[in-house]
């Protein structure tokens, strides 16, 4: 059973409900009109000032609009037409000041305070227009035969000379017919060594005193009952350029007056199977390998002034059959 206190509270609530239920509808309408501006136009207008003098503010166009500038020149006090499909929001500061957020047809939001146009968002076109324009090169444009650009030719850097110590794929002369793996008997732009005659004669005479005799250039074979598993060729060469021990190319002193002869032996089929490979066990893979030795030669300095120095070069010495397992 309800206590007297709850009964009294319930009666008060009933009286309040009856009071609000019987409140005249026109009183609600009067209050709403004081707080909001009621219009039948399309769009929404919120938080307008309650003063009777507060106008329904139109939305001005952007200041950089050429059409708007032309209208302002013709009439100093233009009244822009209202774009009714924009959403406008007014402030509650005072009757002659207002703050609006408007959405343009392209979806961009804008701020307007006392007819001052402030953009909140930038369209894609505006963002693209602010991007720096890359510099144009003659290759990026159409060039007509009579244009000055067609007559312009950018300066070209001179071709690099053949360096002494580069790992070039073809360090020898272009017309070299017998290019060896480690030496060139003919090179382009070989220097004139006449200025080094005194130094070559006094300091490097030992390099030009050897008198090697050419040997048989046929494949190495022993007696009638001997045969090597890898075929090779012996040569006596006078190289003008060679591969050093550090795998860089360098010019070698070799001309009509000062000659350095070296004897080399190269594999006919380097990294190829040895002869009689089928007779080896299946677990072994016989391969012909080129072996090298080092020999010191009088060479031309790689950089700086023309000079003679000593350097070690890789000399192909023999061809051996090596067994690989697996």
From Swiss-Prot:
Disulfide-bonded cysteines: 230-288, 267-319, 274-321
Region span, Disordered: 56-82, 152-174
PTM field: During the immune response, cleaved in the same manner by SPE.
Example of a GO biological process term: motor neuron axon guidance
An example molecular function term from Gene Ontology annotations: receptor ligand activity
Compositionally biased spans, kind Basic and acidic residues: 162-174
Coiled coil: none
UniProt keywords, alphabetically: Antimicrobial, Cytokine, Developmental protein, Disulfide bond, Fungicide, Glycoprotein, Secreted, Signal
Superkingdom to which the source organism belongs: Eukaryota
Compositional bias segments (type: Polar residues): 69-80
PANTHER family cross-referenced by the UniProt entry: NEUROTROPHIN 1-RELATED
Quaternary context: Homodimer; disulfide-linked. Ligand binding induces conformational changes in the extracellular domain of Tl. This may enable a secondary homodimerization interface at the C-terminus of the Tl extracellular domain.
Protein name: Protein spaetzle
Annotated organism of origin: Drosophila melanogaster (Fruit fly)
């Amino acid at each position: 059973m309800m206590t007297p206190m709850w009964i009294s509270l319930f009666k008060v609530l009933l009286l309040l409900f009856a009071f609000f239920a019987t409140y005249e509808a026109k009183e609600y309408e009067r209050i709403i009109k004081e707080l909001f501006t009621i219009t039948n136009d399309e769009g929404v207008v919120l938080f307008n000032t309650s003063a009777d003098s507060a106008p329904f503010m139109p939305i001005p166009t952007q200041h950089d609009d050429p059409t708007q500038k032309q209208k302002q020149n013709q009439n100093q006090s233009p009244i822009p037409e209202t774009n009714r499909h924009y959403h406008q929001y007014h402030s509650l500061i005072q009757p002659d000041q207002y703050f609006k957020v408007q959405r343009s047809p392209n979806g961009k939001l804008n701020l307007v305070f006392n007819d001052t146009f402030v953009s909140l968002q930038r369209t894609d076109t505006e963002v693209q227009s602010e991007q720096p324009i890359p510099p144009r090169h003659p290759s990026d444009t159409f060039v007509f035969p009579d244009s000055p650009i067609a007559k312009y030719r950018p300066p070209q850097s001179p071709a690099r000379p053949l360096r002494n110590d580069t790992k070039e794929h073809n360090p020898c002369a272009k017309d070299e017919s017998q290019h060896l793996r480690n030496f060139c008997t003919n090179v382009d732009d070989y220097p004139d060594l006449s200025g080094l005659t005194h130094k070559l004669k006094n300091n490097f005479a030992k390099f030009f005193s050897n008198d090697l005799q050419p040997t048989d250039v046929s494949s190495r074979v022993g007696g009638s009952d001997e045969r090597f598993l890898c075929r090779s060729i012996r040569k006596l060469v006078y190289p003008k350029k060679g591969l050093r021990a550090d795998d860089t190319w360098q010019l070698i002193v070799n001309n009509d007056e000062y000659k350095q002869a070296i004897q080399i032996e190269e594999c006919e089929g380097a990294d190829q199977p040895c002869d009689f490979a089928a007779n080896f066990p299946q677990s072994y893979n016989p391969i012909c390998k080129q072996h090298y030795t080092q020999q010191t030669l009088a060479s031309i300095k790689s950089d700086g002034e023309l000079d003679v120095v000593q350097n070690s070069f890789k000399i192909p010495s023999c061809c051996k059959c090596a067994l690989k397992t697996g």
